[in-house]
């Protein structure tokens, strides 16, 4: 009876559609894969910590076997291998060429650091008068020395000769001058040479030694080594000379001292300025011209203070005025007196005539109203 009822229900078309729709909309369940490791399981809402694996302890036999295998691999790798492709060889060559180029800058920096360190050692040895250390640092590398620069300078432009002269080390000064240390025109940042530094420190004999070092006397070996040269004429000394060191000789320097002394004109430039120091370092004397023989302009170049807003060439050029004034000089900001224009003068004259006419009329009316 139940089976026949079910057959009648399924025979209805609408009920058959509902049954098929219900079967299609039934949700599909997700099948979860159980955890294979017990450490991944969650218990009581918390994940269980993983068990750390104990690292194997390397005993002596294992270490010996490892090194023997490593040596065997090195010996086997020394066997000739097959030729690499051309592309791989080009890549390796390009990589090797690029690496030294990238390492060029640090090498240059290291070279500069070594040069500065060598200069500091030479200056210290000259100041202490250590001739043994000076010979070791200044002798060429072919002779077993370090090959240092005898005219090396520090940040304050001090040379080894300046340090030795300032410290009064006569033996070191004589050795440096004998090796050809330069001092003519070589000044520090304050414009002082080695002779002046020795005089300031109270060593006049060292200063005299420095000034007389470039005389015309020569040692016998230098006389035999010198070759005859053509005679030349010196305009400063007014005589002919054949010595190549004539311009640094005592006679030439004395003839230069007979020149007209520089004038004491104020330049308006402090002696501590970098430009003044550069001129002194180049051999310039204060007050003399800027030419090689002390000729040329000695005063500042006249300039013009442009105080208006007119274009260039609008009016006649004003008189040049030197702008190198001293401190707190009121002439630097003083201007010319204002000159009124013609239109301004005519307006003032008209107002004056009108005021005069009103005064005459006022006096006339006052006179006519008087009773005698």
UniProtKB/Swiss-Prot annotation:
Source taxon at top rank: Eukaryota
Molecular function, one GO term: nucleic acid binding
ANK repeats by residue range: 124-155, 156-186
Gene3D superfamilies registered for this protein in UniProt: Ankyrin repeat-containing domain (1.25.40.20)
Alphabetized PROSITE patterns for the sequence: ANK_REP_REGION (PS50297), G_PATCH (PS50174)
InterPro entries: Ankyrin_rpt, Ankyrin_rpt-contain_sf, G_patch_dom, GPANK1
Domain G-patch: 271-317
Sites of the Glycyl lysine isopeptide (Lys-Gly) (interchain with G-Cter in SUMO2) crosslink: 306
Renumbered residue ranges of the record's region Disordered: 74-110, 211-233, 251-271, 330-357
Ranges of biased composition (kind: Basic and acidic residues): 330-340, 348-357
UniProt feature, compositional bias: Polar residues: 220-233
Keyword Ubl conjugation: yes
Keyword NAD among record annotations: no
Pfam families: Ank_2, G-patch
Keywords, ordered alphabetically: ANK repeat, Isopeptide bond, Repeat, Ubl conjugation
Protein name as catalogued: G patch domain and ankyrin repeat-containing protein 1
Gene that produces this protein: Gpank1
């Amino acid at each position: 009876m139940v089976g026949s009822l079910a057959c009648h229900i399924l025979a209805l078309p609408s009920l058959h559609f509902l049954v098929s729709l219900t079967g299609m909309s039934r949700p599909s369940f997700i099948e979860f894969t159980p955890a294979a490791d017990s450490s991944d399981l969650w218990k009581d809402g918390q994940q269980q910590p993983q068990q750390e694996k104990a690292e194997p302890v390397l005993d002596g036999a294992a270490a010996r076997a490892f090194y023997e295998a490593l040596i065997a691999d090195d010996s086997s790798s020394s066997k000739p291998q097959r030729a690499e492709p051309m592309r791989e060889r080009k890549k390796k060559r390009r990589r090797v060429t690029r690496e030294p180029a990238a390492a060029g800058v640090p090498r240059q920096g290291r070279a500069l650091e070594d040069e500065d360190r060598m200069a500091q050692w030479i200056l210290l040895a000259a100041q202490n008068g250590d001739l043994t250390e000076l010979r070791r640092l200044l002798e060429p590398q072919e002779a077993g020395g370090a090959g240092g620069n005898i005219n090396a300078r520090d940040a304050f432009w001090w040379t080894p000769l300046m340090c030795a002269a300032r410290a009064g080390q006569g033996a070191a000064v004589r050795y440096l001058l004998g090796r050809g240390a330069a001092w003519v025109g070589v000044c520090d940042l304050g414009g002082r040479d080695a002779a002046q530094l020795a005089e300031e420190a109270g060593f006049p004999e060292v200063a005299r030694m420095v000034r007389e070092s470039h005389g015309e006397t020569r040692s016998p070996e230098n006389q035999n080594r010198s070759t005859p040269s053509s005679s030349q004429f010196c305009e400063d000394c007014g005589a002919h000379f054949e010595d190549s060191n004539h311009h640094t000789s005592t006679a030439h320097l004395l003839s230069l001292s007979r020149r007209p002394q520089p004038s004491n004109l104020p330049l308006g430039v402090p002696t501590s300025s970098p430009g003044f120091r550069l001129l002194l370092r180049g051999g310039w004397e204060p007050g003399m011209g800027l030419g090689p023989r002390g000729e040329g302009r000695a005063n500042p170049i006249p300039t013009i203070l442009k105080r208006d807003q007119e274009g260039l060439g609008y009016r006649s050029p004003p008189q040049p005025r030197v702008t190198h004034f001293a401190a707190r000089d009121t002439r630097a900001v003083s201007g010319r007196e204002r000159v009124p224009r013609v239109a301004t003068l005519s307006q003032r004259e008209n107002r004056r005539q009108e005021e005069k006419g009103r005064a005459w009329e006022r006096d006339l009316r006052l006179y006519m109203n008087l009773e005698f």
